């Protein structure tokens, strides 16, 4: 198992976002703004879904990595730290998924 974490990736996204857009894909996406980054996130999500549906495990692994990376870029642009997302996941997993979903529908 790798010791690499989403927090590590978040730090890399932060560092690379400060580079020149001509030298870094991350900086280029951040400079292009949320519409471009969100579009790329959507494209990667579709590619991951297609890999899952076709049962292509290798491609799904590759696309899942792309999806996580682009999600962190979108969060960076929105100034939402990964810590906030993890706190929300922790809150949700404190109860059953069905109960949590029902509580969202009633609010």
UniProtKB/Swiss-Prot annotation:
GO CC terms, sorted: cytoplasm
Predominant localisation class: cytoplasm
Enzyme class: hydrolase
GO biological process entries: L-histidine biosynthetic process
Disulfide bonds: none
EC number(s) on file: 3.6.1.31
GO molecular function, one term: phosphoribosyl-ATP diphosphatase activity
Family: Belongs to the PRA-PH family.
Protein's name in the database: Phosphoribosyl-ATP pyrophosphatase
Lineage: Bacteria, Pseudomonadati, Pseudomonadota, Alphaproteobacteria, Hyphomicrobiales
